[in-house]
Amino acid sequence: MSESELQLVARRIRSFPDFPIPGVLFRDISPLLKDPDSFRASIRLLAGHLKSTHGGKIDYIAGLDSRGFLFGPSLAQELGVGCVLIRKRGKLPGPTVSASYSLEYGKAELEIQKDALEPGQKVVIVDDLLATGGTMCAACELLSQLRAEVVECVSLVELTSLKGREKLGPVPFFSLLQYE
């Protein structure tokens, strides 16, 4: 991983204390999205990791609603594979499968179209940030319902103090930037 590219990405992450509630330090990726060089570097770094780890053995990138959609298609293009979308409940047409997960204030559900993947296809799940791991864990469950193989989960940012990586169990996880 090129240190200068990683520094370029890291410099574009802003921190906002006490947002959205007191005691939370929010990591904002908006400056990264505004800067084409930084965004391109983030995609190159994630793709470089996946190429070195999995070679050509990835069939699809699965982007998580909603900020995973910002990285999923570009990452898929860089790898020469397709991209599928995992959406919040009620956002996809046609037959879907769903998985629910807990939020601090209730439950939520993710869905994917039933015909999005074939059994045995190798998939990498991408999101902008891993916090508690609930969303990414639900996405893994969803893809297992389709009998796809989740070969890895990746994100731009990981909030290590929330231990989301542990929720993923045996599924490998990679992040470009780690914050407490």
From Swiss-Prot:
Enzyme class: transferase
Keyword Transmembrane helix carried by entry: no
PTM annotation (Phosphoserine): residues: 4, 15, 30, 66
Pfam families found in the cross-reference section: Pribosyltran
Listed InterPro entries: Ade_phspho_trans, PRibTrfase_dom, PRTase-like, UPRTase/APRTase
UniProt-annotated location(s): Cytoplasm
Phosphothreonine: residues bearing it: 135
Keywords: Acetylation, Cytoplasm, Glycosyltransferase, Phosphoprotein, Purine salvage, Transferase
Domain of life: Eukaryota
Residues with PTM N-acetylserine: 2
GO cellular component entries: cytoplasm; cytosol
Pathway note: Purine metabolism; AMP biosynthesis via salvage pathway; AMP from adenine: step 1/1
The keyword Cytoplasm is assigned to this record: yes
BP terms from Gene Ontology: adenine metabolic process; adenine salvage; AMP salvage; cellular response to insulin stimulus; GMP salvage; grooming behavior; IMP salvage; lactation
EC number: 2.4.2.7
GO MF, any single term: adenine binding
Modified residues annotated as N6-acetyllysine in this record: 114
Residue numbers carrying Phosphotyrosine: 60
Reaction(s) this enzyme catalyzes, per UniProt: AMP + diphosphate = 5-phospho-alpha-D-ribose 1-diphosphate + adenine
Quaternary structure annotation from Swiss-Prot or TrEMBL: Homodimer.
Family: Belongs to the purine/pyrimidine phosphoribosyltransferase family.
PANTHER family reported in the protein's UniProt record: ADENINE PHOSPHORIBOSYLTRANSFERASE (PTHR32315:SF3)
Annotated NCBIfam families: apt, PRK02304.1-3, PRK02304.1-5
Task performed by this protein: Catalyzes a salvage reaction resulting in the formation of AMP, that is energically less costly than de novo synthesis.
Protein name: Adenine phosphoribosyltransferase
Gene from which this protein is expressed: Aprt
